[in-house]
Each structure stands twice: as C-alpha cells, then as structure tokens.
Design a protein with these regions (language model features):
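Short interface patches used for recognition in eukaryotic signaling and trafficking proteins
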Residues: 17-21, 45-58, 71-77, 110-119, ...
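Non-catalytic pre-domain segments flanking phosphatase-related domains
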Residues: 1-32, 40-53, 204-207, 213, ...
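C-terminal cap/substrate-recognition subdomain and adjoining C-terminal extension
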Residues: 73, 86-232
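Acidic di-acidic motifs
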Residues: 31-33, 148-149
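A structural signal for short, well-ordered beta-strand segments and their strand-loop junctions
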Residues: 29, 78-81, 146, 171-173
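A generic local structural motif
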Residues: 14-16, 64-66, 132
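Short, acidic loop-to-helix structural element flanking the phosphoryl-transfer center
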Residues: 52-79, 85-90, 124
Length: 232
C-alpha cells in the first residue's frame, strides 16, 4: 500500500470545483457491465425484479446519465466493453431508462463485436482495443481515465501507463458484482470527485464499504484513501 494523502487532498467531503478544460482534453474509457450497468445483479436473479429493485435501477440510470454528462464536460467518453454493442444499447434503455446514449455523443466500442469473429483470444481483446484507441487519440488528449470493475483489465491499463508516460493515465477500480445501491453510491461519489482524479497518473480503488445504521446507506472510501501503485 502506498503513501497516504496529505490533509489538503483528503476526500472527506465532495469537491464541486470543475477542472479547467485542457487544450488537448480528457478521454474516459468506461466499462459497462458492473461499472455503469448492474449486470451481475440482474443476471444472478432467480426471481423477477421487484418493484423496489426496478425503481432502484431506474434511479441508477438517472445517476449514470448525470455521470456521463459530467464526464462529457471535461472531454470525450467511450464505453469500452467485452459485451456486444446491442447489449449495451438494450440494457441502457430497458433497465436504466437511458434513451440518449448516442445523442450524448458517447461512442460504444465492443471488443466482442470487433475481435470474436477474427478468432482472437478474449484475453487480448481489451489490450488490442486500448492500443487502437490510443493510436487514434494520442495526439488529441492529455488525460486518459479508465474505469472498470475487472482487476485483469485494470492491470492491462497499468501496463499501458508504464509504456506511455506522455499522457496522464489514471484508473478507477470498481467493486466486483455490486448490488444496485453499491453501484449508485460509487458513481455518485465519482461525480463529485472526478475533478481530483483527472491528470493524476494514479490508480484509485473503490474497495472499502461500511454499512451504516440505515441498511440502504453505505459510506464509500477509496482503498486507504488512495492506493498509489504507479510510480516513476
């Protein structure tokens, strides 16, 4: 575990100040399943969703929409997923109630759609996609933010950080197989803290979850505030 933050960087309260828009901008690469969409929760359900769960998922959709719009204020957003593009589009509408993903000018890159028919091993999909995206945008961006729930994918991004030091690359590790409230809390937390992450060249972990008196009230922290894995 790396060093703790100095007091002025402690994330005990939301930061509302927006970062200055950079000339070359910021690119967000955000996973879909269990990062924006509560995929594990709905696929592991053996019974139909209750009305409360449906309403929670719609609430998640509203928060995801706000988060994506917030990210778009700072740069370009790409949903980078191993699922199909049709899955992203259908679940965004049918579950989250988000009908304007494309209208938001958010690009969806499906590694499954791009590489499966080419016979490329799945373990290389994200790495190949990342290289292609970087080659396209490297002269247009200053900051790259990668958000994902997969430790394997986060490790791919970390390797990429070491090879490409001309760009500020930060990763955000979401919890694996979150329930709906967990995902809502994670994304709401990022909405108010994303400005701190941009341009930091660090790896952030949303790991620790402590349950409060209200069973629906969770308090999230970045692992030991910040887990500084990357270093020069």
């Amino acid at each position: 575990m790396g060093p703790t933050l100095s007091s002025e960087h402690h994330l005990s309260k939301p930061y509302e100040d927006k970062p200055k828009r950079l000339d070359k901008g910021t690119l967000f690469l955000i996973d879909w399943d269990d990062t924006l969409m509560c995929t594990s929760f709905i696929t592991l359900k053996t019974q139909p969703l209750t009305e409360k769960e449906q309403n929670l998922i719609l609430n998640l959709g509203n928060i995801v929409s706000v988060f994506l719009s917030h990210c778009l204020e700072y740069g370009k957003v790409i949903i980078l997923t191993n699922s199909s593009e049709n899955w992203v589009k259908s679940t965004s509408v049918d579950y989250l109630g988000i009908t304007d993903l494309i209208d938001k000018n958010i690009k969806i890159i499906s590694t499954r759609d791009n590489y499966l028919k080419k016979g490329i091993d799945k373990k290389y999909w994200k790495e190949l996609a990342l290289e292609e995206i970087f080659n396209k945008y490297q002269n247009k961006i200053e900051n790259l933010i990668c958000a994902n729930d997969s430790e394997k994918d986060i490790n791919i991004f970390k390797k990429f950080m070491c090879k490409n030091k001309g760009i500020n690359i930060s990763t955000i590790k979401f919890k694996r197989k979150p329930n709906i409230m967990t995902l809502i809390k994670e994304i709401k937390y990022l909405i108010t803290h994303i400005n701190i992450i941009i341009g930091t060249n660090k790896n952030y972990y949303l790991l620790k979850e402590t349950k409060e008196k209200n069973e629906d009230d969770f308090n999230f922290h970045f692992g030991n505030l910040f887990d500084y894995i990357f270093s020069d």
